[in-house]
Curated annotation (Swiss-Prot):
LRR repeats lie at residues 226-245, 246-268, 278-302. ARM repeats lie at residues 427-467, 511-556, 558-600, 602-643, 714-756. GO terms for biological process: positive regulation of proteasomal ubiquitin-dependent protein catabolic process; protein quality control for misfolded or incompletely synthesized proteins. The keyword Repeat applies. Interacts with the ELOC-ELOB/Elongin BC complex. Part of an E3 ubiquitin ligase complex including ZER1, CUL2 and Elongin BC. SUPFAM superfamilies: ARM repeat, RNI-like. Expressed in testis, spermatocytes and spermatids (at protein level). Expressed in spermatocytes, spermatids, prostate, skeletal muscle, ovary, small intestine, heart, brain and pancreas. This is Protein zer-1 homolog. It holds the Pfam family ZER1-like_2nd.
Length: 766
C-alpha cells in the first residue's frame, strides 16, 4: 500500500527561502542585485542545500524563476560556506562561478553547462587548493575563448568573434584532486597534457573522448580505482593499458550500440585478462559491445535449476575465474544479459524488468541515449506484462524526465511509460506525493516540449488521475497548458479530443472562483473557436460535443462566463449547430444545458428575448432527444424568462400565453421517474422560482424538477434540498393562492419524500 511521508522541516524551510529570497535570506541592493543580510551566517550544510535545491527548482519546477544574482549571496565565505555543489544545464554562466570563487569548494559538479567558457577555467584555479572532486561533463565550451579576429580593442565596434581552443590550461596546482569527469568534451582537447600534473587520481571519466594512445593512464596505475571510457573507440592497445591499472574496482568500457560502426569486439581472451589482471574489480560495464560466441556456454550446457550468481556456475566462461560475484555488471544491449547464470548482484540489461530498471538507474544522469531505450523496454513491460517494482520504476522515470527536460526521446518514451505506470491497476500502490510528482513532470514535458507525441502522451497520462481533485494543486497551470494545446491552428485531432475532455473534466465539480479564473484565461473563447472550426468543417464529433459540454460546465452559476459566451457570438453558434446537426441529441442536450445557465442570470436574459430565440426554445419543448433532457432544459430557459413577468416579454411573436401553454403541455408529458443525465451542485437557481406568483408555469417546472430528483436520487438530493432551505419554500407553495393545484400536490409529495428520507436515515443509536 502507498504511504505518504511529510517533507522534512529542512526541506520545507529551504523551499520557502528559495521562493522568497529577498524576504528571508537577502535583500535587493539596486532592485536586481541580491545581497545577504549582514547579520546572517550559514554553515556549509545549509548553503550546499540551498544551492543544490535552487538548481533542482530551476530545472524541474514550473513556477520558479531563477534570480540573476543568486550566486552573489554566497560570495563571502565569512558569512556563507559552500563545499559540495552540483550545477547543471544553461542555468550556470561564467559570472555565477566567478561570484563564488572565494569559497573553499571540495566538490564541484558541472553537468552540461554549455554557457561556461574559458573564463570559468580561470575561476576553477581559485578552487585548486581545496577541490577533491570535479566534473565538467558536457561543458563543451569551457575550453573555448572568444577571439576578435580584427584585433580591435574597441568593444563598441561590431566585429565578429570566433571561438578559439584554449590549449595552455592544465590542472597544475590541483594537488588534492582525486575524482575528475571530463565526459563529452570535444575531441581535440589535449587530455594527456591537461591531466599530466595530477599525481593521485582515483577516478577518471573520459566518456566520448577519443584517444589513440591511452598509455598516459598508466601514470595512475597505483591510484586509479574507477575508470570510465564510455563510447571511446577501443583497440588492443587500449586493453593492454587498462589491464595494467591493477587497482581498478570499477571499469566502464560500454558504448552506445547505435552511435557508430565499431570494429572492436570483446573476446573471451579480453574478458579473461580483466579477471586475471584486475583482481580488485567489483563493477564492470561492457554494455553495447559485440561479444564473440566463445565467451559463453550454450543453452544446452547451462546448469538447470535456480539462477546462480556463483562464479563457478557462470554461463560467461571467463567470469568463472572471478574470486567473488561482481557488485555490478553492465550488459545492456549485450547478448550476455540473456544468459541464465550471471555472477553479479546487480545486472543492467534488456532481458527482464530487474535488468531494465538497473539500466535506467545506472545511465540516467549522463547517457540519455541509452536511458531512452531502457525506458522504452520498461514501457513494453508495463503495457504487455505487469510491472512488479512499480514504485522504483515510477521514481526512475520521474528522475529521467526531470534530468532531461529537453531531450525528445526521453520525453516521448518517459511520458508513454508513465501512462501505463499510473493506470488504475497500480493506483493503490502510489502515494499522493508520488502521483503529484508524476503530474509535475508531465506538465513540465507539456511546457518544455511542443511536440505532438509528447503532448499526446502527457494528456493521456493526465486522464489516469481523478479530475479535478488530483490536479487541483496545479489547477491554473494545467488549464493554461491545455488551452494552448487547443489553439485552433493545431490540427492534431487526437490531442484536441483528449485535451477538450480534460478541460471539461477540470471545470466540472469545482468552485465558482476556479471557473471564473479559467474563463479569464480564455477558456470560453477557445471552446467557441473550436466549435466554429467544426461548424466550418460540417463535423459534429467528440471535440464538438465535449466543447459544448465544457461550456455548460464552466458557465454553471458563473455570470461572467455566461456573459463571455454571449459576447463572443455564442448564440449564433448555437443556432448554426442546431440547424447543421438537427439529429445530434447529445449536442442539443449540452447546448440547452448551457443556455439554462445563461438564462439563470437576470442581467443577461434580455439578450435571449428575441422572436428567433423564443421560437427556437418553444419548438424544442416538443423534442424527444435524449429522453426528456432537451425538452426539460428548454423549459428551464423559458421558465427563467417567464419569471421576469409580462412586462419583460419584449416580443410580439410568439405570444407569452402561447409559450406558457406549450410549457405546461411539455411538463405534463414527462415521466416523473425519468433517470437524469444531469448533476446539480446547488438548487439555488431552481429554488428562486418557487416563492412567486408572477409565473405559475415557472413555479411548476421548478417543483417538478425537485420532485423528479428527490424521487429518483433521494440519497443525493433530499439532503441537498433540506440543507438549502427548500422545505419551507415548498410549504409556502401549498398555501399560495396563485399556485396551481397540481403544483401544490407535487410540492406535498416532495416534502413527504424528504421527511421520509430524514426519518429513515436518523441515527437512533446511543
Amino acid at each position: 500500500m502507498a504511504s505518504d511521508t511529510p517533507e522534512s522541516l529542512m526541506a520545507l524551510c529551504t523551499d520557502f527561502c528559495l521562493r522568497n529570497l529577498d524576504g528571508t535570506l537577502g535583500y535587493l541592493l539596486d532592485k536586481e542585485t541580491l545581497r545577504l543580510h549582514p547579520d546572517i551566517f550559514l554553515p556549509s550544510e545549509i548553503c550546499d542545500r540551498l544551492v543544490n535545491e535552487y538548481v533542482e527548482l530551476v530545472n524541474a519546477a514550473c513556477n520558479f524563476e531563477p534570480h540573476e544574482s543568486f550566486f552573489s549571496l554566497f560570495s563571502d565565505p565569512r558569512s556563507t560556506r559552500l563545499t559540495r555543489i552540483h550545477l547543471r544545464e544553461d542555468l550556470v554562466q561564467d559570472q555565477d562561478l566567478e561570484a563564488i570563487r572565494k569559497q573553499d569548494l571540495v566538490e564541484l559538479y558541472l553537468t552540461n553547462c554549455e554557457k561556461l567558457s574559458a573564463k570559468s577555467l580561470q575561476t576553477l584555479r581559485s578552487f585548486s587548493h581545496t577541490l577533491v572532486s570535479l566534473s565538467l561533463f558536457g561543458c563543451t565550451n569551457i575550453f573555448y575563448e572568444e577571439e576578435n579576429p580584427g584585433g580591435c580593442e574597441d568593444e563598441y565596434l561590431v566585429n565578429p568573434t570566433c571561438q578559439v581552443l584554449v590549449k595552455d590550461f592544465t590542472f597544475e596546482g590541483f594537488s588534492r584532486l582525486r575524482f575528475l569527469n571530463l565526459g563529452r568534451m570535444i575531441d581535440w582537447v589535449p587530455v594527456e597534457s591537461l591531466l599530466r600534473p595530477l599525481n593521485s587520481l582515483a577516478a577518471l571519466d573520459l566518456s566520448g573522448i577519443q584517444t589513440s594512445d591511452a598509455a598516459f593512464l598508466t601514470q595512475w596505475k597505483d591510484s586509479l580505482v574507477s575508470l570510465v571510457l564510455y563510447n571511446m573507440d577501443l583497440s588492443d592497445d587500449h586493453i593492454r593499458v587498462i589491464v595494467q591499472l591493477h587497482k581498478l574496482r570499477h571499469l566502464d568500457i560500454s558504448r552506445d550500440r547505435l552511435s557508430s560502426y565499431y570494429k572492436f569486439k570483446l573476446t573471451r581472451e579480453v574478458l579473461s585478462l580483466f579477471v586475471q589482471k584486475l583482481g580488485n574489480l567489483m563493477s564492470l560495464d561492457i554494455s553495447g559491445h559485440m561479444i564473440l560466441e566463445n565467451c559463453s556456454i550454450s543453452k544446452m550446457e547451462e546448469e538447470a535449476g535456480q539462477t546462480s550468481i556463483e562464479p563457478s556456475k557462470s554461463s560467461i566462461i571467463p567470469f568463472r575465474a572471478l574470486k567473488r560475484p561482481l557488485q555490478f555488471l553492465g550488459l545492456f544491449e549485450n547478448s550476455l544479459c540473456r544468459l541464465t547464470h550471471i555472477p553479479a548482484y546487480k545486472v543492467s540489461g534488456d532481458k527482464n524488468e530487474e535488468q531494465v530498471l538497473n539500466a535506467i538507474e545506472a545511465y540516467t544522469e549522463h547517457r540519455p541515449e541509452i536511458t531512452s531505450r531502457a525506458i522504452n523496454l520498461l514501457f513494453d513491460i508495463a503495457r504487455i506484462e505487469r510491472c512488479n517494482q512499480l514504485l522504483r520504476a515510477l521514481k526512475l522515470v520521474i528522475t529521467a524526465l526531470k534530468c532531461h527536460k529537453y531531450d525528445r526521446n526521453i520525453q516521448v518514451t518517459g511520458s508513454a511509460a508513465l501512462f501505463y505506470l499510473t493506470n488504475s491497476e497500480y493506483r493503490s500502490e502510489q502515494s499522493v506525493k508520488l502521483r503529484r510528482q508524476v503530474i509535475q513532470v508531465v506538465l513540465n514535458g507539456m511546457e518544455s516540449y511542443q511536440e505532438v507525441t509528447v503532448q499526446r502522451n502527457c494528456c493521456l497520462t493526465l486522464c489516469n488521475f481523478s479530475i479535478p481533485e488530483e490536479l487541483e494543486f496545479q489547477y491554473r497551470r494545467v488549464n493554461e497548458l491545455l488551452l494552448s494545446i487547443l489553439n485552433p491552428t493545431r490540427q492534431d485531432e487526437s490531442i484536441q479530443r483528449i485535451a477538450v475532455h480534460l478541460c471539461n473534466a477540470l471545470v466540472c465539480q469545482v468552485d465558482n472562483d476556479h471557473k471564473e479564473a479559467v474563463g479569464k484565461m480564455g477558456f470560453v473563447v477557445t471552446m467557441l473557436k473550436l466549435i466554429q472550426k467544426k461548424l466550418l468543417d460540417k463535423t459534429c464529433d467528440q471535440v464538438m460535443e465535449f466543447s459544448w459540454s465544457a461550456l455548460w460546465n464552466i458557465t454553471d452559476e458563473t455570470p461572467d462566463n455566461c456573459e463571455m459566451f454571449l459576447n463572443f457570438n455564442g448564440m449564433k453558434l448555437f443556432l448554426d449547430c442546431l440547424k447543421e446537426f438537427p439529429e445530434k441529441q447529445e449536442l442539443h442536450r449540452n447546448m440547452l444545458g448551457l443556455l439554462g445557465n445563461v438564462a439563470e442570470v437576470k442581467e443577461l436574459r434580455p439578450q435571449l428575448m428575441t422572436s428567433q430565440f423564443i421560437s427556437v426554445f418553444s419548438n424544442l419543448l416538443e423534442s424527444k432527444a435524449d429522453g426528456i433532457e432537451v425538452s426539460y432544459n428548454a423549459c428551464g430557459v423559458l421558465s427563467h424568462i417567464m419569471f421576469d413577468g409580462p412586462e419583460a416579454w419584449g416580443v410580439c411573436e410568439p405570444q407569452r400565453e402561447e409559450v406558457e401553454e406549450r410549457m405546461w403541455a411539455a411538463i405534463q408529458s414527462w415521466d416523473i421517474n425519468s433517470r437524469r443525465n444531469i448533476n446539480y451542485r446547488s438548487f439555488e437557481p431552481i429554488l428562486r422560482l418557487l416563492p412567486q406568483g408572477i409565473s405559475p408555469v415557472s413555479q411548476h417546472w421548478a417543483t417538478w424538477a425537485l420532485y423528479n430528483l428527490v424521487s429518483v436520487y433521494p440519497d443525493k438530493y433530499c439532503p441537498l434540498l433540506i440543507k438549502e432551505g427548500g422545505m419551507p419554500l415548498l410549504r409556502d407553495i401549498i398555501k399560495m393562492a396563485t399556485a396551481r393545484q397540481e403544483t401544490k400536490e407535487m410540492a406535498r409529495k416532495v416534502i413527504e419524500h424528504c421527511s421520509n428520507f430524514k426519518e429513515e436515515n436518523m441515527d437512533t443509536s446511543r
